[in-house]
Structures are given as C-alpha cells and as structure tokens.
Amino acid sequence: FLVNPETAFAPFHTALTGITAEMVAQSPTFPVLWETIGPILDSGLLVAHNAPFDLSVLGRCLRDYGIFFHRQVPYACTCQMIRRLLPQLPNHRLDTLCQYLHLELDHHQAGSDSRACGQILLHLMDTGASLSPFMRTYDFIRIGTVRPSRNR
C-alpha cells in the first residue's frame, strides 16, 4: 500500500525507498487506508524485521490521527530471531539475511520486505528452530511491547 502522508516529503526517504511525493499524491490518507489494514492486524501474527520500530511508528500514527485501536497484537521480529539463531552473519540487516538465504529482495519496498520476512520465518520453521522465545505482544494503547511477566 502507498499512503499519502499529508506532510512534506524528505529527500532522505525518497532516496531510501524510491517513493516520491508524486507517487503518493493520489494515494489514500492513513485514516482511509486504516479501514483496510486494521482488520489485517486483527487476523493473526505480524512478522517484520525490526518489528518494534515499525509497530511504534504505526502506533504513533494511530495516536496522531486519533484512531483508537484496542488490540494487543502478537508479533515476531526476524531481526531478533536472526541475532540469536544466526550469530555468524556480519550484520543482521534484512538485505544481508536475504542474500545469505538466497531470497529475492527489493529492499525498502514494503511488499518485498514483507514477503522476505514471511520467507525467513518459514525457513526458520523448516530448520526446526524454536520460535516461541521470539513471540511478543505489542500494545497499541501504550505504544510498546508488553513485557512478559516473570513468575518467581
């Protein structure tokens, strides 16, 4: 999805993503797009690379637009997984990981990044890695990860 940010476009973001102000000028604004993506967040596990950052941006966007989203969303972060499961990699960037696993990636393009994260998760599951230590919950009211309780 492309979204009209309703703000000035920073050259840094265009250089990073290749997305220009012209490309999003006729795109829906976030509140309109939320009608489509909100139900997706209600449907299962969210998987992203550096997920806490992406979720915090989404949470602040919801707050700034005055959109109430009551959910605590289960998520898994492929960056956190790879740090622990593949420590031999030179870094834990998504493009490095995709190259290592021979996955196609058009970096910083949301659809491609999302597909890659799904493929990474499937790869880790196929190798028998235990993913339960990486399952987290994000609270969109507090805009933060819910810390697991520790029983003593």
Regions found by a protein language model. Give the residues of each.
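Acidic, divalent-metal-coordinating active-site segment for phosphoryl/phosphodiester hydrolysis
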Residues: 110-123
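Acidic two-metal-ion nuclease catalytic site recognized across multiple nuclease folds
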Residues: 120-152
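Conserved non-catalytic scaffold segment of RNase H-like nuclease domains
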Residues: 1-73, 87-108, 148
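Generic alpha-helical structural context detector
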Residues: 80-83, 99, 119-122
